[in-house]
Amino acid sequence: MSTSKRKRGDDANWSKRVPKKKPSSAGLKRAGSKADRPSLQIQTLQHAGTTMITVPSGGVCDLINTYARGSDEGNRHTSETLTYKIAVDYHFVADAAACRYSNTGTGVMWLVYDTTPGGQAPTPQTIFAYPDTLKAWPATWKVSRELCHRFVVKRRWLFNMETDGRIGSDIPPSNTSWKPCKRNIYFHKFTSGLGVRTQWKNVTDGGVGAIQRGALYMVIAPGNGLTFTAHGQTRLYFKSVGNQ
């Protein structure tokens, strides 16, 4: 007597079924994927020759998110922008007045966010409210207590410079060599994750008076009175968002 069992009709049909293939995820385009996102826009601010930055004792404050209205890559296309990243590349060169003395100084560069600029860029002393007795020591400066709701330090970087009482064109005696010093330094920083949102007025220029909320300043101050000039460029990576 055979002990094998006959397959039921539905069992036989089930075993013959071919499993359905799942659609490839590569063929599906997700909403909001990187392919759908607009690429970052780039604005480059160059400072060289007649446009070099002069950094006096007490510092200098410049607006850097200067996105004028337009259709080019460096222009804002809408009434709102988001600045994500910044690259800073400069040569700091001690000026002739500073080179007359043997000196060292610790300078500072800040990126400062201004919630309500009010039509004009502030001075470093407005932001940090330092007394005149601390004018030469920027590493000690802090945002004014009364204005901490307005000014926010996004980044802060230190750098060191030196002078030895000589200028670059001086020539040592034939039997002497002079030790090099940091009268000319290269300063590079790249920072991301800034998330600076700027709301613009209904005007076409990119000055501080065109900003309703969210100005971004680059503040530079020399240490110990070692004044200098800055030669190079700042590159900003941003997007135009919001309404036209």
From Swiss-Prot:
Keywords: Capsid protein, DNA-binding, Host nucleus, T=1 icosahedral capsid protein, Viral penetration into host nucleus, Virion, Virus entry into host cell. Residues 1-39 are annotated as: Disordered. A motif (Bipartite nuclear localization signal) lies at residues 1-24. GO terms for cellular component: host cell; host cell nucleus; T=1 icosahedral viral capsid. GO terms for molecular function: DNA binding; structural molecule activity. The keyword Hydrolase does not apply. Coiled coil: none annotated. The keyword Aminoacyl-tRNA synthetase does not apply. One of its GO terms (biological process) is viral penetration into host nucleus. Pfam families: Gemini_coat (PF00844). Disulfide bonds: none annotated. It is found in: Virion; Host nucleus. Encapsidates the viral genome into characteristic twinned ('geminate') particles. Binds the genomic viral ssDNA and shuttles it into and out of the cell nucleus. Plays a role in protection of the genome from degradation, virus acquisition and transmission by insect vectors, infectivity, and systemic movement. The CP of monopartite geminiviruses is absolutely essential for virus movement. Homomultimer. Interacts with the movement protein. Binds to single-stranded and double-stranded viral DNA. Belongs to the geminiviridae capsid protein family. This is Capsid protein. It comes from Maize streak virus genotype A (isolate South Africa).
